[in-house]
């Protein structure tokens, strides 16, 4: 801005070439000029030197500056009285006596409202001077417009932040209230279902009561008939119970029918009952004691029988063991006296014995020492029962002492 003003003061407009070059320079200056922010700096305006021919314009600017300064003072007074009170909602109660000295005229609604008509007037007025004085007239208006836009932007930002905070608080409260309403709705639904169930149950009970009343009214005349039928049915059941075990009489000759037989049997049973009543068999205390003694005797007999069975089983087991031991002793004595040849004939075949011995003759005659009681006939591969040979040998060669001991064991 200083360079442009210097050029306008040092080089006056002479000739058409200068006017065209001035227009070009004016356009270039308007496109590349940088305006600094003058937020809250209305009183610190830089004064610029104007040429001698522009005295009326400077006077107009001074008058406008004085008018603007008076308007700024008024807006400051209004903002100090009203604006400060509007923006002190977050301060403490003790701060009300000494409010802070804050200059909030740039973001106050009243100052904005007052400045907007002047800005519109100043922007609408176009300077009718030369191209060198045009940038000096437009620069204050543009700076004021920029300041106004910045103040409005700040105000809108504050309002948006406040709205967001309020919206978050409202959302939290709405969610809380919605949760409470949902819980209350569930409770009311449960209560409604319970009341509906009770209503349906009462209706069913009422319907059943009406049906029962109608049935009672219809069946009340049949009460006497039902009582008589009950007595007859009880008599029939008793008769059926007494005659349900009756034997078939198809193959038995009876004089008369079954009813006559039952009458005669009933007469005999009555006679038996009378005789037993005369003898007092069923009501005496002695019979009760005898029955108790009989039950005790029965229990003792069962226990003794069980013990006898156990002892008899043990005796049989001992007898079997003794017989086994006696047989083993007799077998051992016989084997000692006879040797190993006879047992080999009992338990092994002659052919297999010859094969095991490695090609020995199959029909080998036994010597008289091996079998003294046998004849001199040729020996054959025959199997002799061990019990028969054992009994014969034991009778022939067992000493009497061993046989006596065996009989004692057996």
Swiss-Prot record:
Keyword Cell division included in the entry's annotation: yes
A GO term for molecular function: microtubule binding
GO biological process, one term: cell division
Annotated region described as Disordered, given as residue ranges: 1-104, 118-143, 353-410
Subcellular location(s) of the protein: Cytoplasm; Cytoplasm, Cytoskeleton, Microtubule organizing center, Centrosome; Cytoplasm, Cytoskeleton, Spindle; Cytoplasm, Cytoskeleton, Spindle pole
Bias (Polar residues) ranges: 373-384
Coiled coil: 156-208
UniProt superkingdom: Eukaryota
Ranges of compositional bias, category Low complexity: 385-394
Modified residues (N-acetylalanine): 2
Entry keyword set: Acetylation, Cell cycle, Cell division, Coiled coil, Cytoplasm, Cytoskeleton, Microtubule, Mitosis, Phosphoprotein
Modified residues (Phosphoserine): 105
Gene Ontology CC terms, in alphabetical order: centrosome; cytoplasm; cytosol; HAUS complex; mitotic spindle microtubule; nuclear microtubule; spindle pole
Similarity comment: family membership: Belongs to the HAUS8 family.
Subunit structure and binding partners: Component of the HAUS augmin-like complex. The complex interacts with the gamma-tubulin ring complex and this interaction is required for spindle assembly. Associates with microtubules. The interaction with microtubules is strong during mitosis, while it is weak or absent during interphase. It is unclear whether this interaction is direct or indirect. Interacts with EML3 (phosphorylated at 'Thr-881') and TUBG1.
Functional summary from the UniProt entry: Contributes to mitotic spindle assembly, maintenance of centrosome integrity and completion of cytokinesis as part of the HAUS augmin-like complex.
Identification of the protein by name: HAUS augmin-like complex subunit 8
Source organism per UniProt: Homo sapiens (Human)
